[in-house]
Amino acid sequence: MKTVNRTTFAIFLAGLWAGASVAIGADASPATGRKVINFNRDWKFAKGDLQAAETLEFDDSSWTEVRLPHDWAIAGPFNPAENGYAGKLPWKGVGWYRKTFTLDDSGGNRRVYFDFDGVMAFPKVYINGELAGQWDYGYMSFRVDATDHIRTGRNVIAVRADTTRHGTRWYPGAGIYRKVVMTICEAVHISHWATFITTPE
C-alpha cells in the first residue's frame, strides 16, 4: 500500500509541475493581468567589445543569429595550452547580444520587466540605447525594470557580457547561458520573489 501511495503522490506532483510549466508560457492571467513571454528566440550575437552596439541605429545585420540559452565559448577552438579546469575553451572575453521586438500599446499603466536566469558575466542591459540595469555576477538570476525605457512599437534590447574580470575553478560558460522572459503586469502587483510560506514549526 505504501508503494501505491508513493506512486500516486509522485504522479500528482508531476501533474502540478506540468500545470505550472504551461501557465508560465500562457497569455495574461484574467485574475492578475500578468503576462509572461518567452524571450529566447531571435537574438543576434557578436563577440568583441564593439562600440555603440547598444544604440538603436547600430547595424547588426552581419551578427550571428542565436537562440537562448547560448554559450559563445563552446564554439571553440580548444586551446591545449589552457588549463583543463575551464575546459580549454575560450570563455574569456566580451560579447554582445541584440534583439529587436515590437510592443503593442498596453492600454494602461503597466510595468515591463526582463528576467534573466543567468548571464556570464557582469552583464549590462540596454533598452533602446539606455542603460536599464546591470548585474555584478554571473551565476544568479536578476530582474531589469524596463518600464521607463520601453515604448510602443519597435524596441531594441542589447546585452553586454564581460567575462574578463571573472575568476573560476571550473568551466563557467560565457554569454546569456540561461533563459530570458519578459513580464508585463499591472502597476500594482506582487513583486518578484515577494511570496513566502512560513510555519510555526
Show where each model-derived region lies:
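Bacterial N-terminal signal peptides
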Residues: T8-S21
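Accessory carbohydrate-binding/adhesion or oligomerization-edge regions at the termini
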Residues: I24-G84, K88, T102, V156-D162, ...
